[in-house]
Every structure is written in structure tokens, then in C-alpha cells.
């Protein structure tokens, strides 16, 4: 039986549960449940604090876990990334009062508040800087106003919270983060784990592509299929209409409209784009 960790709350939890449900796994049901056994798939899901997940996986108590890259790195647990999930994107940066001039070198000898002390200490050590790192479990942005810290290091998504507190990020990004699946370091993925990973990959692939159908004159088929090569070649079927064929191919979601414009310019008709729910590619 697989034991999988999922964030117990927050934005990572919500999207992770959506993906798992789309992949055919049992939902949490009660938001206060600490674990759910999916008998049909022989998987037990444990709902844990995101910052603790990598530690449990590294210790062997759990097989895989969904967490943030920044949280996994800060935990210093012996895990590796098995799969990037493409949501929960953010950056980890230093920030200080917006009305002051700051550089990373100015952090030397200062007080830095953060919920990610190991990421900060590692970065400072790599730069040869020394500072007092204050660990806080939340509301890091207000620590400067309260006189606890001179600067902070925190996760930045939109930057709105920083601006509300009169802060601005400075220096380069310490870590670019997103939701990831982590496994124990130096341990191969098992066949049971591969089934779960393949299902999730199928959901992610489906989100990135659309299925495109259109009709085109055979005289323009080569030009049209050059625009829609698909993953391993488009499907081409004859139509009752003389010298015309129907074409079906997967296309990247981001460029679907531009592709449809090109097909229309080639004389293609009945150009339709449809969602792909699940895929195995």
C-alpha cells in the first residue's frame, strides 16, 4: 500500500486535492480528517503541514509527498523532486522598507525575520555574510513595523502583502518555488508509485493541450499538418466531400488560437478546439 502526504490546508492543498480527484483517487470528505484510505487504489493519504511533509518522506514513514519546493529545501530533508506540478508558483526573496535603499550586502549584521531560516542561513553563508536570523511561523511582513527585524525573507507571489506593509523586494531571487512531489533521496520510483505519477502526469498534460479538429482540402494537407504535427503525427480521415479530409491533432493550449488562425488562412473549415480531461502520453 502506498502512503502519500498531501498538504492539510492552504492553496497547495486545494489544487493538490483537485488533481488527485481528477486522477481517480478518493477525496478527503471531512476537512478535519488526518488521513483517508482509498481502498480501490490501495493508497492511504495523510494530510499534514506542508513544511513537515519532506521530513516524513525522508524518514521513510511516507512514500511520496506533495509540498512546495521552498519548504522541501528549507527542511533540509534527504528528498528529491520526482515531479513538478505546475501550480503554487512563487519566489523567495529578501524585502525591506520601500523608502530605504537596500542591497543584499547591507544585510550583514542585521536582523532578518523569516519562516524559512535554513534557506536564509545557507544563502547568507554562501555570500560570506553574518546576520541574526529570526524564525517566525507567520505574519513575517509585520515584523519590521513591530521592531523585531530590519528586513525579512519571505515567499512572494503577487507582492500585494509586501506593498500593504510598505515593503519592497530587493536582490536576486533565493528560490523559485512551485508544488512538487518529493520522494526519498537515492530511491527509485516503484511500480506502484509510477501508477500514481503517471495518472497525475496525464492530468498535467491534459491541462497543457487542446484537441483540434478541422477539415481541409488535400491540396493543403501538407501545409496544414505542418502547423498541427501533433505529438506523433495527426490523425487524417477521408471525408465524403471530394478531395477533403478531416484532421485531428493535439496542440499546445497557449498557441491554439494562433494555430487556428493559420489553418483558416489555409482554407481549413470547421476548426474546433476541445478540452482534454485525462491523457496518457
UniProtKB/Swiss-Prot annotation:
Protein name per UniProt: ATP phosphoribosyltransferase
**Reaction(s) the record says it catalyses:** 1-(5-phospho-beta-D-ribosyl)-ATP + diphosphate = 5-phospho-alpha-D-ribose 1-diphosphate + ATP
GO terms of biological process kind:
L-histidine biosynthetic process
What Pfam families does the database record attribute to this sequence? Answer: HisG, HisG_C
SUPFAM superfamilies reported in the protein's UniProt record: GlnB-like (SSF54913), Periplasmic binding protein-like II (SSF53850)
Its pathway is: Amino-acid biosynthesis; L-histidine biosynthesis; L-histidine from 5-phospho-alpha-D-ribose 1-diphosphate: step 1/9
**Stated role:** Catalyzes the condensation of ATP and 5-phosphoribose 1-diphosphate to form N'-(5'-phosphoribosyl)-ATP (PR-ATP). Has a crucial role in the pathway because the rate of histidine biosynthesis seems to be controlled primarily by regulation of HisG enzymatic activity.
